[in-house]
């Protein structure tokens, strides 16, 4: 079968990203399917493509497939998939994964958690996620203020 060689995964990842940024989800998925050895960058790119096109359930399914393939999500992967969560229970499950990965204090992840909990009106957990950051940046503060402003 024809596939993108594992010798240079950068090419496949770049193509997935390019198609995703152009809004060509099907092309991004086709290239992703050709990548023989999918790393966290490839998985994150295809998950991001689905989220940007509004295919949230599919993005979460891809995230689950990524974990089943024993590819560890990074901070950016978690932050993207948290934006796709449609049920609080899903978000809490992913939050447990984040804690297990010891990424909960990273600003990009904690800010995504603040936003996710805020969308569901769980201000206590949003505040707790914020408090995990040692040095919240302006995006974190803006997100927290927005969450409190919504409720």
Where are these regions (language model features)?
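Pentatricopeptide repeat
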Residues: 7-8, 12-13, 17, 28, ...
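Proline-centered turn/helix-capping motifs that create local helix->coil transitions or kinks
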Residues: 4, 86-93, 103, 121-125
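Acidic, Ser/Thr- and Pro/Gly-rich low-complexity regulatory segments
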Residues: 1, 5-6, 16, 95, ...
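Alpha-helical solenoid scaffolds that mediate protein-protein interactions
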Residues: 2, 35-36, 66, 98, ...
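Residues in the short coil linking paired helices within alpha-helical repeat scaffolds
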Residues: 24, 55, 61, 87-90, ...
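Polar, glycosylation-prone regions of secreted, cell-surface, and some intracellular proteins
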Residues: 3, 15, 22, 33, ...
